[in-house]
Curated annotation (Swiss-Prot):
Name of the gene: H2AV
Induction: Restricted to actively growing cells. Peak of accumulation in the G1/S boundary and in the S phase.
CDD domains recorded: HFD_H2A
Entries under SMART domains matching the protein: H2A
UniProt name for this protein: Histone H2A variant 1
Gene Ontology cellular component terms for the protein in this record: nucleosome; nucleus
Taxonomic source organism: Arabidopsis thaliana
Keywords on record: Chromosome, DNA-binding, Nucleosome core, Nucleus
Biased composition (Basic and acidic residues): 18-27
Length: 136
């Protein structure tokens, strides 16, 4: 009987040990979840490392801060664009709504000076072109 049953006993012990290890092991938490933001902190950190001129040296909190800024700006633009689309009674945000939202806000306009494809132009009529009715 030597050799019979011994292997099963060892296998049972290792399985029990693995279950104990699984209990002790914590589920990995992403840096985005730790910071409480939706934008990917790890991906932004990798992009910062490849683009920085300091030989890939980027602080750990720099990526969290950058992701937070990007998330805030995105939420701000989407909120204003959603308001613009709601004013026009449309359910889908288009580049036109983004253009109206960005150009309507003074701070976002100075931050985003580039052209938005398909955004059109901002409606504006110069004061001198408006027909003035005078009572005489």
């Amino acid at each position: 009987m030597a050799g019979k049953g011994g292997k099963g006993l060892v296998a049972a012990k290792t399985m029990a040990a693995n279950k104990d290890k699984d209990k002790d092991k914590k589920k990995p938490i992403s840096r985005s979840a730790r910071a409480g933001i939706q934008f990917p902190v790890g991906r932004i950190h990798r992009q910062l490392k490849t683009r920085v001129s300091a030989h890939g040296r980027v602080g750990a909190t720099a990526a969290v801060y950058t992701a937070s800024i990007l998330e805030y700006l995105t939420a701000e633009v989407l909120e204003l664009a959603g308001n613009a689309s709601k004013d026009l009674k449309v359910k889908r945000i288009t580049p036109r709504h983004l253009q109206l939202a960005i150009r309507g806000d003074e701070e976002l306009d100075t931050l985003i000076k580039g052209t938005i494809a398909g955004g059109g132009v901002i409606p504006h009529i110069h004061k001198s072109l408006i027909n003035k009715t005078t009572k005489e």
